[in-house]
Amino acid sequence: MFDGHFVRISLLIRKSKQGATNIYKQIGWRDRTGLSALVTEKTEKSSGPLWIGPLCDSDIASRLTEEKAEQICGLNLKEMPTDWDQQRLNLVLREIRRSVRHIADAAPLLSQNHLLIPMDVFAKKSGRGGPPSIKKSIAILQSNGFEAARGPYPEPTLITNADESSVMHLLNQIQVNQN
């Protein structure tokens, strides 16, 4: 979960040879020349090693809504420090909601193999001007049978189970229609 420039994570540690082998299969490198090109070994144009497997448990993450986060983490007027006013409380509650926004919607995709595409990276890789609207990008992918959601990251990020060539083709259609 993003909190400013920090990322909070929760881990469950298990000892197992088979588990270690399964974990090792989820480690890879990302080829910087494509949106998602994963490679099995380090190359001159790759970053890594990186975790390339699912990012969360869908059942748990799908329950992490803005309302639930505010209920669990939020303060009320009685719990506030005495020097706080309603405006400061509202700011804290807004930040709590922002920190989990889009997690529940993206949970099914984050719990499986997926592409995670920052929209500004798409714009750069496609060779066009700016990126298309993330809402239009999600809509066109879903209308073509793919799953898609906005990622729970500060920058507009698309998460999908579509392959890279389908993403490039479909999102470039939006770009052409916007010009």
Enumerate the language-model features and the residues they cover.
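SAM-dependent transferase fold signal centered on methyltransferase-like domains
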Residues: 1-179
